[in-house]
Amino acid sequence: QAIRLLDNIATYKDKNKAFYQLNIGDKSEVKNQNSDKIEIKAIIDNIEHSQISYNSEKDISIAPFPNIIYISASRKGATSTIPLFSNFEIGPEGENVLNVIEHFSDEILADSLQGEAEGKTFSYVLSGWLQKISPDVKFEPKLAKQADISYSLYDQHRSSNVGYGLSYSLPVIVALLLGTLNQDSLVLIENPEAHIHPRGQYEMSQLICLCVEAGAHVIVETHSDHLFDGIRIFCKENKTSFADKVIAYWCQLDENKCTKVDSCHIKRNGKVDNWPQGMFDQFLIDAERLI
């Protein structure tokens, strides 16, 4: 939310509007109860070195800020129709995703993203990764532009009649692929693992890593040990020092309801330095009780 707030400030240059556009209330609602003010600063080193800061008691400091591609944890899911916009940007809940797919369908993507897809274009690669998430499913986007709606078919079934995993993963995959085409953008994804079975979560982790290797800038918020372990495996098996591109943070509240942030480093062998207590350890805890 902090990054999205800075993005809105850069867009609207109005503190109050920047807050309300995100539906998070005013600054009094998002400020920690133990803080006197809100202060946020972002420095983007690899995207034309831009910087923006916000202080609730001072003027806003604005410099160029990257385009944000944001996919919320609350996505449209298995709905019969998806809204269309007049632009080619994907909405936070996956709105306009089929219009975006049509617009970029013939764009050539990096060779590393192709995998087992039939071709290197956006549409082929997208279909290929959807099949990795849910094997042998045929995806068909349908647009009714005069009615400003769209819908998708999976094996000739409407999305409301198939599992949530496909419709929930679709905007995530599209956002990641867009990040490789627009490398001045920042891709923010909440819970890419939502409604996906463990094998599919692993495949999603591989796509995230491949897109970062292809030039995308990605921030992921996840509760999935399958996703995290998949990234660790990619670090171990990749020969291009991918681990050096990964930063992991573990956030939890302390006794004063303040957010405590611990960082850990994934080494090139996939092992983790400074593993924070409580981070993705429930499987081991449960396994010990079952043995």
Predicted segments, located by residue:
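Walker B catalytic acidic pair
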Residues: 190-191
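Short, contiguous strand/loop micro-motifs
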Residues: 114, 194-195
